[in-house]
């Protein structure tokens, strides 16, 4: 069995504009600490449009990053299909009369799911730098929370990235 993912959660709902008029962006970076990509740095950006109706059935929030960035899609309703397969995931109330569904995929076969309050995203309290050298600010002190996980698509533990350390902050 894969080791439990070491991940943390933080509530970023305060970063969503009240008027819903602008896209919220978060840059992220980190390093894989276990698995076949151990030590590899990844980085990317999250973009979220708070004006998108919460009840629409299409992805309204996604992390964009080049491999081996984690593939993270927060979708509204239904099922997410990825290049590695499909996953049914946890549904959470978004505080606006709708819901979000959380899927986090690491490597080739690791799915981590966690039901939390609106707009909580996994990351750890480590200092990281973006690939272009930009220094990330320190994350707040966080409390680790266990994640439910499902393993599929691989029988080789080396193919499963079982831990990701991630920092996240609002893009400038």
Predicted regions and their residues:
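An extracellular/secretory-lumen and virion-surface interaction module
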Residues: 2-172
């Amino acid at each position: 069995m894969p080791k439990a993912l070491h991940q943390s959660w933080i509530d970023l709902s305060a970063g969503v504009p009240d008027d819903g008029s602008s896209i919220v962006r978060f840059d992220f970076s980190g390093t894989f600490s276990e698995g076949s990509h151990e030590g590899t740095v990844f980085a990317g950006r999250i973009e979220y449009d708070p004006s998108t109706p919460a009840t629409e059935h299409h992805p309204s929030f996604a992390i964009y990053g080049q491999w081996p960035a984690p593939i993270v899609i927060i979708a509204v309703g239904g099922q997410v299909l990825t290049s590695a397969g499909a996953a049914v995931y946890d549904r959470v109330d978004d505080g606006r009369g709708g819901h979000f569904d959380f899927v986090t995929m690491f490597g080739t076969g690791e799915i981590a799911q966690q039901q939390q309050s609106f707009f909580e995203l996994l990351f750890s309290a480590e200092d990281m730098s973006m690939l272009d050298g930009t220094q990330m600010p320190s994350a707040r002190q966080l409390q680790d929370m266990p994640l439910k996980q499902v393993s599929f698509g691989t029988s080789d533990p080396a193919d499963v990235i079982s831990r990701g350390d991630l920092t996240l902050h609002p893009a400038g």
